[in-house]
Design a protein with these regions (language model features):
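Extreme N-terminal starter segment of soluble prokaryotic enzymes
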Residues: 10-14
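Short, acidic, Ser/Thr-enriched surface-loop or helix-capping motifs
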Residues: 17
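Alpha-helical substrate-recognition element adjacent to the catalytic core
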Residues: 3, 9, 21-170, 185
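Substrate-recognition "cap/lid" segment bordering the active-site pocket of phosphatases
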Residues: 162-197
Length: 197
């Protein structure tokens, strides 16, 4: 089931976000994977507590909750510089990429990294890879929010359903497959398919 082989079965489509909407996974992923790997990869351990608080604020506890990982990283790095916690070489070019790129994913970042000497691109890619590894290593204790499966079963009788997530495809396939949510979906649209907009 991909985004190129979607076959319309209904006149209506319902798109369901994964992390934080269908799946109760945002807290654990940001506290144990995204945030710690960001601090490690960008050498921010001297300001670990403040940086972790900053990361969680941007990605969980503000209007930017659920932002694409690469855009969230750009916001966090800009705030690190603003607060005087570090100097991020190549940040301006990285920020521009997050605003202009048609796709924000590891393959897209790898392509731009191969054409540039920008250390921010390189660290962002390393951080994202490390984060994916950390997510993959999480115990399979994730779960959908209550009543998600029954609601999806009911909606699937009247509409096509699609998972829409800024997470990577492997994580969404694993989580939605493990909890039988994917069986109701006509498509799993992840960061590799482009932005949610």
């Amino acid at each position: 089931m991909g985004y190129f082989d979607f076959q319309k079965k209904s006149d209506c489509i319902v798109c369901i976000d994964s992390d934080g909407c269908a799946m109760d996974t945002m807290e654990v992923k940001h506290r144990t994977c995204f945030g710690p790997q960001w601090i490690k990869t960008f050498g921010l351990t001297e300001h670990e507590a403040e940086c972790m608080e900053l990361w969680l604020s941007i990605n969980l506890y503000s209007i930017t909750r659920g932002i694409n990982r690469f855009k969230g990283l750009a916001l966090a790095l800009a705030e690190v510089e603003k607060r005087g916690l570090g100097n991020i070489e190549g940040l301006a070019e990285y920020e521009a990429w997050t605003k202009e790129a048609k796709e924000l994913s590891n393959p897209a970042l790898l392509a731009v990294t191969q054409k540039s000497d920008n250390p921010c691109f390189e660290k962002a890619l390393l951080w994202s890879i490390r984060t994916n590894r950390a997510i993959h290593a999480l115990p399979a204790e994730d779960r959908p929010f209550p009543n998600v499966k029954s609601a999806m079963d009911a909606m699937a009788k009247q509409a096509d359903l699609a998972a829409v997530s800024s997470a990577n495809r492997e994580a969404v396939e694993a989580e939605w497959g493990r909890h039988h949510l994917a069986e109701d979906c006509s498509a799993l649209l992840t960061q590799e398919a482009g932005t949610k907009a």
